[in-house]
């Protein structure tokens, strides 16, 4: 069998940033330096001062 190198850590692209709260790499909001996934953002948005516009 051939030796397999371990993957390099991602430095750019969609999978490079992680959610600071849960650690997932899916749908991370980077705006305003939040670095939260959309699920975590919806949970704590009111405490951060964001409100829903209609």
UniProtKB/Swiss-Prot annotation:
The entry lists its GO molecular-function terms as: rRNA binding; structural constituent of ribosome; zinc ion binding
Question: Please, one GO biological process term?
Answer: cytoplasmic translation
InterPro entries per UniProt:
Ribosomal_uS14, Ribosomal_uS14_arc, Ribosomal_uS14_CS, RIbosomal_uS14_euk_arc, Ribosomal_uS14_sf
Instruction: Answer yes or no on keyword Zinc.
Output: yes
Q: Which Pfam families match?
A: Ribosomal_S14
Q: Where does Zn(2+) bind?
A: 19, 22, 37, 40
Q: Which UniProt keywords apply?
A: Metal-binding, Ribonucleoprotein, Ribosomal protein, RNA-binding, rRNA-binding, Zinc
Q: How is the cofactor bound?
A: Binds 1 zinc ion per subunit.
Query: What are the names of the required cofactors?
Result: Zn(2+)
User: What do the Gene Ontology cellular component annotations say?
Assistant: cytosolic small ribosomal subunit
The record's listing under PROSITE patterns reads:
RIBOSOMAL_S14
Q: Entry's NCBIfam families? A: PRK05766.1
The subunit field of the Swiss-Prot or TrEMBL record says: Part of the 30S ribosomal subunit.
Q: Which family does it belong to?
A: Belongs to the universal ribosomal protein uS14 family. Zinc-binding uS14 subfamily.
Question: What HAMAP family would the database entry show?
Answer: Ribosomal_uS14_2_A
> What function does this protein fulfil?
Binds 16S rRNA, required for the assembly of 30S particles.
Question: Which named protein is this?
Answer: Small ribosomal subunit protein uS14
Source organism per UniProt: Aeropyrum pernix (strain ATCC 700893 / DSM 11879 / JCM 9820 / NBRC 100138 / K1)
